Amino acid sequence: MSGVRMQKKNRRALGQSLEMAQFLDSGSNKIKRRIRDLERLLKKKKDILPSNIIVEKERTLEALRLELHNHEVKENIRKNAKKYHMVRFFERKKALRRYKKALKTYKADENEANKEALENAEVDLCYVVNFPKSEKYISIFTEDDTEASAETNLRRKAFRQLVRGKIADKSLPVSLSNILAGKKLSEEAIGVTLDDALSRSNQTDASHQESDEDSDSNENEKEEDDFFE
């Protein structure tokens, strides 16, 4: 019996794989239509469908949603690459010139002001190269972006802070040394995103909360010890 069950399981897996195969690398409209069809099927006939079919369709639906998301990200990257190619090209050259100038100045006089200027120039250069391909590019040089909204300025600041943090913990997709060697983001890489910043912020908040809870717990224990002495 176990062999029969295994054969049925393999056939179901093969059927699901074949269903997914026809949607891989297909247009988003085709994927969306299939998602809607599956959603309607599960909504209308969930009470009468066998449980194994429900599980199978739900897994296919989840896989299709992921495929749609990946397709939309790739399409967004393609559009942004075409739209902002020249802007990023000139900003990269400008940021590189400023970095080399700041480095030369710092080597001539290693004071705090020159050190800070060099660090800022490094952030700017890494910002331009590692800015996420999936996002509308935000110019690092504000004098070239006089019509920027308050939200744009906030996002620019957030990206700069994120890049600065990733320089410190050496987690940039393209490091400064690689940039100076002429390297850029690969076609598959997206770059840094604000999701990274939010994740970092949440981890910091959680760490602070745990620290506060430990502190409160220690104080409560001390008060109890004092009470029973």
Curated annotation (Swiss-Prot):
Keyword Membrane attributed: no
Disordered as annotated region, ranges: 196-229
Main location: nucleus
InterPro entries: Efg1, EFG1_rRNA-proc
Keyword Glycoprotein applies: no
Recorded superkingdom: Eukaryota
Places the protein is found: Nucleus, Nucleolus
Keywords: Coiled coil, Nucleus, rRNA processing
Biased composition (Acidic residues): 211-229
Listed GO CC annotations: nucleolus; preribosome, small subunit precursor
Any Pfam family hit: Efg1
Coiled coil: 24-119
GO biological process: maturation of SSU-rRNA from tricistronic rRNA transcript (SSU-rRNA, 5.8S rRNA, LSU-rRNA); nuclear RNA surveillance; re-entry into mitotic cell cycle after pheromone arrest
Function: Involved in rRNA processing.
Family of this protein: Belongs to the EFG1 family.
Descriptive protein name: rRNA-processing protein EFG1
Organism field: Candida glabrata (strain ATCC 2001 / BCRC 20586 / JCM 3761 / NBRC 0622 / NRRL Y-65 / CBS 138)
Gene: EFG1
